[in-house]
Structures are given as C-alpha cells and as structure tokens.
C-alpha cells in the first residue's frame, strides 16, 4: 500500500500557495484552490485550520444542494456567467443539450466526490442526478466525440480531461493513444494562449507543458469518476482493468527527463504537479489497489518508487538552476 506520510511534507508547499492567493480579490479563487487541496486523502495534514475546513465543506454542501435543484440549462448559464479566469468568454452561448448535460454532470460529480472523500453526508436526492443512467449517458456522450466537435477550439481542459477518462472507462482494455491525447492538449493550450490574455501563464510552446497540464486534469477526473461510479454502482469490478493512472505518472516522469527544465520556473506548472501529487494520482492509485486488490507493481517501471532512480533524478533536478523547487518537492517526495 502507498505511504501517505509525504502529505506532511507537502504542508509547506500548500502553505506557500495559500500565501500566494491570500491577497486575491474575492474569495472564489481561494475557495477553488482549497477545494482542489481537499481532494487528497492527506487533507488533514494540509487544511489544519478548522475555519478553513469548515468554510470549504459548507461551501461544497451549499453548492451541491443548490445545483441539484437546477436544470442542466441553468447550470450551464451559471457556469458561463462565472468566468473569473477569463477562459470561457469565447465559448459559444448556444450548444447542444448533451454538452450542457455533460458539463453539469462533471460539476456535480466533482462536488459530490469532495464530500464523499471526507466522509460527509450528501443530499438524499443525489440519485436524481448522479445515477447509473446518467453516468452511462455521460460516457456515451464522451465516447461519441461530440464534445470535441461541438466545442472545437472553445472547450477547456477540464472537459478534455473528462473526455479522456471516460473513453478509458468505456474502452478500458484499449491501450492509451498518447499521440491523440497530446494532440487534444496542444490544441487546447493554443486556445488558452490566443484567447486568455488575462491568465498569467508563460507562453511556453514546450509540448511537455501542454502534456502535463492536460494529464493533471485527466488524473483528477479519473479519480472523481472512479469514486462516483463506484459509489453509485457499489461494484468492485466496474473498473477492474483501469490502471492507467500508473501510465500517466510514469509518462510524466519519463517525459520530464529529456525536457527543457526552464519550464519548471512557471509557478502554474508547479501547481499542476502539486495537484497531481495531492489530488489525483496517489489517491486514484490507492483506490484502485484497495478496491481491486491489485498490485500496480511500480517497481517494474523503475521510475517512481525505485529509490535509486528517484534519488538520481532528484540530484539531476537540483543541479539545474532553472528547476522549480516546488516541482522537486511534490513530484519526488
């Protein structure tokens, strides 16, 4: 089983980012970041402030309760009006009802998973929206490539991450087509650069940047959908063959070794990697191990849990003046 003690070390990283967002206007961005941190099993080591925790879960319960009473149209319209990062302003106002349903469901699933993972009670009427029929409909929509067709050039990475994960759920015996996934992420990243001038990200053309950003959301979405589907189905066999989280993490490690380390100077990338480490990868792997009694046998990859290789990579990264220290901490420890 995976050792979660590294979450204690991660507390200083989380504190650093909380300090970074301390003076942001409004509370939504703070809440967004706290929500992301809450997705990991180690949240007790990170969100030790009882007021922050209380605020987080009160906010989540309130949002979930409100959205369970809304139609898919209402949820979509609210989402379009809440554009604090500026990346939805170009999304078409008129879209297929299936698209509205898809994004509404992913929103509900994310909120529900936050509560489930904290042992919180969820509203009794949750089954009106998150049920087997709707989950299967989401999978069908994603597998039809409707999202990429109807929102081409205007969707955002959360949607693509959900699309990739749902394709894995539907076709979990098919090897991952990394070239296709990379192509999707490259297109989305170009959209960010062209349309989102207000977002303070470096305009890196490095493919690894696109790759890791997209994979971050894939890991989070995979973990969310896994939790939601298992909760609804109460079945340990539904995702027996889905072990792609291992491939995601291993590919990230492999890719970074031959990349331009200068991109790790980007604080946003450091946050993406922190998100993988805290919110998605470790948790999804742990759940797969626990529910399926599977050993993912990371030792066979000689990448992440091989002490000798890990230390060598650590020294290599530390020797490079452009490497972001937060990256080293969250990806190696």
Model-identified regions with their sequence ranges:
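Preference for long, amphipathic alpha-helical scaffolds in soluble/luminal domains
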Residues: 1-333
